[in-house]
Amino acid sequence: TYKNIPISVISTGIGCPSAAMVIQDLGKINCNYLIRVGTAGSCSAEIKPGDNVIGTGAVRDEGLTSKFLPLKYPAVSDIDVTNALLQASQKNSITVHKGIIHTSDAFNSPDLPADIETAKQAGIKAFEMEASAVMMIGALNNIKTGCILSIDGYVMNISEGNVKPDSKACAEGLSGAIQSALDSFLILNSNDS
């Protein structure tokens, strides 16, 4: 529990397939809310290591979700969960950015530099590996979902072979993301009362 509210913390592993399996099981036990807390790489040098990104939706650049619904169906987070994450982050004085994120199966693909350029032009905030499944499979199982990510570095550095994650900043950002997620559940619980 967190401040007398029952909360479960679950590791799904890496990628959409394992996340989807966990979410489908949560749907069977009447889970109401699900918030993905994790790490991501930013699409812009202005979004720095340790900053948090709240995903409002996700590009479905992975192989799992199209097995459930066609690509024309968007992966979006629940507005109430997103607003609770924003409110909690503001209360906790967390540096946060909100917007679309890019879920991908492969960060080291030859297409990465072009994908990053397109993402920057489209205002994509970050690249990660699970959010589209969390949002879509959650929606299919009547679970309201959200996503908050701590930035560990700039994605373009990966394609240039210059990976220099800022572990200290990312850990601080992740701590803030966890606190914001926990406080979001308090907000959502009070809204449901």
Model region roles, listed by residue range:
Residues 1-83:
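Metabolite-binding pocket within alpha/beta catalytic cores that recognizes anionic/polar moieties
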Residues 17-20, 129-134:
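Short glycine/serine/threonine-rich phosphate/pyrophosphate-binding segments
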Residues 72-122:
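Active-site rim beta-loop-alpha module in soluble metabolic enzymes
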Residues 84-92, 137, 180-188:
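Generic non-transmembrane alpha-helical segments
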Residues 157-193:
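His/Asp/Glu-rich mid-to-C-terminal helical/loop segments that flank catalytic regions of hydrolases
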